[in-house]
Amino acid sequence: VKVRVGNVEHDLRVEAAFSVPRLGFQDNFFCAFQSLLPDGIQPTKFTGPFWGQCMDRVLLDMMDRTDWILCTDFDSVYEADTVQRLLTAAMVSGYDAVAPMQCKRDEGIPMFTPEGHFEIGRVEIAPSWFEATIQPVDSAHFGCTLLRSSALKRTKTPWFVGTPAEDGHWGDAPEGQRQRVEEDIAFWKTWKNSGNTLGICPQIAIGHAELMFTWPGRDLKAVYQYPTEYWKAGGRRPAAAWGSAEHAEASAK
């Protein structure tokens, strides 16, 4: 991949790593194609039920023959120039890992932890923070993230090992108890503890594909519902949806 920074053109060896299930989203595949093919970036995937194990194997497979590895999830959506912009940010900043902004499914919160804010909860960030090309963070995601191969080589192993909550289980622990650590977050902790840097690019953002239920509303306008909200409500449609119990009660008055 040729990346121009100022008057200097860099020729980088870049490949893309995928950990995928057997079935996936076509929108993701085609946006990946439009980003990877023009730059000749070869994608490699490992398939299996355990995301961390597949990602470990695909990273190990390409680590020695690349300068950078693009890790991308099978539910990410991005534009054709996203990878080039990330590579430019990586070369300008000198960071070992560079990720774009991405929101978490269901909750809609940004998927990164500002540096020094692990396990603090809600964090307020000044608007000026988002004006920078890159900002240091303690965790990010793998939606469309660049890893410097030389930094990956010095990262301690194992790479992807999560830990359960204080009670030994994987559910949400009560407040005040140690929460579970997912395998992707465990990777970033190990990455940083191995002396590597991690940055988020506030000026670059990608989408996150997720299933939504669309109901006709009581005013015949669309009402949207997350699947988790549907099941938490006992398999019930939203109150604002046509045919809901609340709709029936209002119609009976």
Positions of PLM-derived features:
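C-terminal catalytic/acceptor-binding lobe
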Residues: 1-8, 156-253
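N-proximal low-complexity "stem/linker" segments adjacent to membrane-targeting elements
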Residues: 1-48, 53
